[in-house]
């Protein structure tokens, strides 16, 4: 029996053929921490008696959740990571001088390479599977173990093959592909599985869409999401100073999958996930008929804060205004994206329409700052989670959607179908 991409990546790192279900220890190619999780890892590192990082050039700290600091507590948290980075002369330390949300910034910097094994103390580390790497979120103490040893242990996950076929319709994107999958299988439908995304739809999907797709693999309970390297991947990597030599793997034709799911996208509409689970997806045509007033629209995050998302929003908002009773916040995922969006005129369009454009931050997504919801408010958001209280008040409501649905809803002041504007 052949192997899946995920099994092959582990086999290459372990030095022998491995299969799903095996417990293995292997070298890590990249360890990722942020301003929320890294201080805990640093404490565990120091408590262990360790003095040096096993692989300092394979450790990245990205201050992205509450930077610039929102209060004294977050400033002190950032200070812990900052001082540790300076103490160990970390090559890959990113703060206000080179800002970005970690799961957008690191691929942009060439620090994610096909064939890598990557861990991060953030659940959406699975985003990096879009580049043909194994990437998964772990706890802060797991991160500390990797910092000390350069290794970690894993149970090789069985794979679910998801085959998307057909052509995406108007205003249907990678976000809709993953919301539709989660709608079908639920938030635990891929528990500790590798979601391997394939099919002609994926072949024609741009990198931004692929990042969105893999980003939300965890919302189905998956250990990782992964897409095989192709010409789209290679084009994305072509101008990056890659940290390592890529090791490209493809699943064998006779690879063993726990399940195969086929999704025909030809008639797929934009999907909007109602509160309070990402699995509560409905077609936008249905939601748009419900006259659901919107208090806030948020476009950003590691899911949908990329250049194409800002371009989509600008296209819809050009010559229009955000509804009087609605506020709109746009948060580009990195400074590079922000600069390019400004260069192309997108930022002027958004501001003229009445949107607020902020620096890169995870703040709004987790209800930290820069977009907190008040009691009983309703938000259409391009983020990845809509749990109770996720973006603020426990009585608020979050509807997850793509950037076109979000922008159209900002203009209409209620949940709207962008195809009808």
UniProtKB/Swiss-Prot annotation:
Superkingdom, natural source: Bacteria
List the GO biological process terms. L-leucine biosynthetic process
Annotated Gene Ontology MF terms? 3-isopropylmalate dehydratase activity; 4 iron, 4 sulfur cluster binding; metal ion binding
The cofactor required is: [4Fe-4S] cluster
Pathway per the UniProt entry = Amino-acid biosynthesis; L-leucine biosynthesis; L-leucine from 3-methyl-2-oxobutanoate: step 2/4
Keywords, comma-separated and alphabetical: 4Fe-4S, Amino-acid biosynthesis, Branched-chain amino acid biosynthesis, Iron, Iron-sulfur, Leucine biosynthesis, Lyase, Metal-binding
EC annotation from Swiss-Prot or TrEMBL: 4.2.1.33
Cofactor binding, per record = Binds 1 [4Fe-4S] cluster per subunit.
Cross-referenced Gene3D superfamilies: Aconitase, domain 3
Q: What are the binding positions for [4Fe-4S] cluster in this chain?
A: 302, 362, 365
Which PROSITE patterns does the record match to this protein? ACONITASE_1, ACONITASE_2
Question: HAMAP family in the record, alphabetically?
Answer: LeuC_type2
Query: Function of this protein?
Result: Catalyzes the isomerization between 2-isopropylmalate and 3-isopropylmalate, via the formation of 2-isopropylmaleate.
Q: How does it assemble?
A: Heterodimer of LeuC and LeuD.
NCBIfam families for this protein: hacA_fam (TIGR01343), IPMI_arch (TIGR02086), LEU2 (TIGR02083), PRK00402.1 (NF001614)
Query: Which family does the similarity line name?
Result: Belongs to the aconitase/IPM isomerase family. LeuC type 2 subfamily.
Name under which the protein is recorded:
3-isopropylmalate dehydratase large subunit
